[in-house]
Structure formats: structure tokens, C-alpha cells
Amino acid sequence: MEEKVFDCTVETGDWRYSAAIVGLIKYFDFLYQKGVADKSELYEFEDDYLRYNSNYISEENYLLFVEKYFKDAMHHKVVENILLKDELSEDEIVLINDKLKANQAMKSIFGKIKYTGENKEEILDLIEKNRLKLIKETYRRGKSLYSNFANENLLFSDNNKVCRLVNYCADMGKKGKSLGYYWDNNTFKFKDEKIFDFIPFAFSKSYDAFFINNNVSIKELKKSNSFIENSENTRTTLFGNMKESAEYIGFDVEVILKSRDKNYYETVYVREKAINIFKQSDDFDYKGIKFWYRDDEKNPKYMEPEIVN
């Protein structure tokens, strides 16, 4: 019987590593679902560490996972799914042509091509031939995707001089010396890992993206964040999850927040005292306030943090 080869280990702790673990597990589960390998060949985990086979991590598989995980944000995928239908509505035809010029990546491939009803195969062929490029450029530049969490120029990079995560990185050409003690950049210390590219998959897909660093165990880490992954109103789900989790949480819980309109991560601690209040409340029913409009609905002011915090 061939021995399992797990050549990498990641431990929970710092939220970045906990989030990377959640993202890696989702990626490996995707490979398992594709039939690439059995889970037992891809990874295993105990309470506080993940072991995995790095040979199954590739740029192509990563991008194909991105396409599936963030499918609603992949313009080419929306076009492809519509064109594979037998009949198209007028609204769908309009949507196709809007998507063909939705961002720079789409424009670079399709140019002035418009769907006419007779060029279906041409468009599908261009998508297939340029799939990985379309995914990569849409993903790394997407304001709700990779660039919300990390420097878009550092995707798939290695041996960086700074951490790839936003607000953890800096322009070393301009500010490198000022980061070190007494203008000596050799004293500047940082930590970057290629596995940080998996962090976006750990956060909820909402405007205010949340990651719950409930790292009492990797099992609970996965469970806590699965509740909020696709929630339309993440704050409501987050508070509800805390109430459901109160029975087994006996400590302060770190919640990481990354809003699309801020270029830094925020940390919120849900204190044990507050968790105990959730535990005692049988009728706790917090409803998150998504938007509060003033005079202009096109420019809503996001009020919930102001009201709740």
C-alpha cells in the first residue's frame, strides 16, 4: 500500500493561517469532487493543524476553483451558461453583450464582438481557449475578489519582500527604508506565504466580508465559517451563529472584517461575556440593517456599523 505524502503542515493561530487552512480545505474538496484524488491523498487535519500534499496545488487548478467558487463574478462563465441554453430571451441577449465588455479582460479577448444569434460557437470557442486568462485577470483585479484581500500583483508570487495581504504590504521602492529601524530596511520583519492566496475563500462573500477565527479546532473553524459563506446579510447570520455556538465557546472569539471600501482588515473581538448573554437569550433575534438611504438611493450610506457598534 502506497504511503500518503503530506509534505506541508499549517497550524492555526494567527488568523491569516487559520483562514488559509479554511481556504485550502475548500480547494482540496473541489479537487476531490472533480475526481482528481481521494481526500485521504489530498489532506488530513487534527484539532490545530492541517497536513496536505502540495503537489496537488497548481495555478490551473487554483483558477478553475476560483471559476467555480466565485462563479457569479466570472463574466465569461455567465456568458457561457447562457449560450449553452437552447433558447435565449431578449434580456439574456442584452446581458451577454454587456458581459462581453464588462471588464478589461473581456474586452481584450472579445474586442468589438457582439452576440448576433449566429456567432454562438465563435464566442464559446474564445472562452474555452482563453478561460484561464479570463479567470485570472477577472479574479486578481476584482474589487470583490482577490484585490479586496491582497495586492493584485502578488497573486501566485513567491519570495516576496513584503506580505501580499492589503495593509500588510508596502511599496518597497518608495517606502522600504522608512519601514526599518533607523532607516535600515534589514531590520524590517514581515511574514508572507504562498498559502495566503487561499485566504479569500475563507471569508464570506458579502460586501463586508467576515472570517470567524474560532480556532478551538479546525472542525469548528470550518463549521463557523460555513454558516456565513453565502449569507446575504452576514451580520444577522454571524450573530445567530454566535448564539448557536455559545454552548461550546468558552472564550473570546476573534472576527476579522474586510470591507470593500477600506484598504485594511479590521478585528472585532466577541467577548465571552457577550457570548454568555447570547446563551441565556431564548428569543434573541438580531436583524442586520443592510442599507439606510438618505436622499440619493444611488449613493446609499452604509449605516449598520454606525448604529450597532
Predicted feature residues:
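Basic, glycine-/proline-tolerant helical and adjacent loop/strand elements
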Residues: 95-242
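Alpha-helical protein-protein interaction elements
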Residues: 7-9, 61, 160, 231, ...
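Conserved small-residue
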Residues: 1-145
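Intrinsic-disorder/low-complexity loop/linker signature
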Residues: 48, 143, 160, 188, ...
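Short, flexible coil/linker elements and helix-boundary hinge sites characteristic
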Residues: 35, 85-87, 131, 215, ...
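Intrinsically disordered, low-complexity regulatory regions
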Residues: 229-309
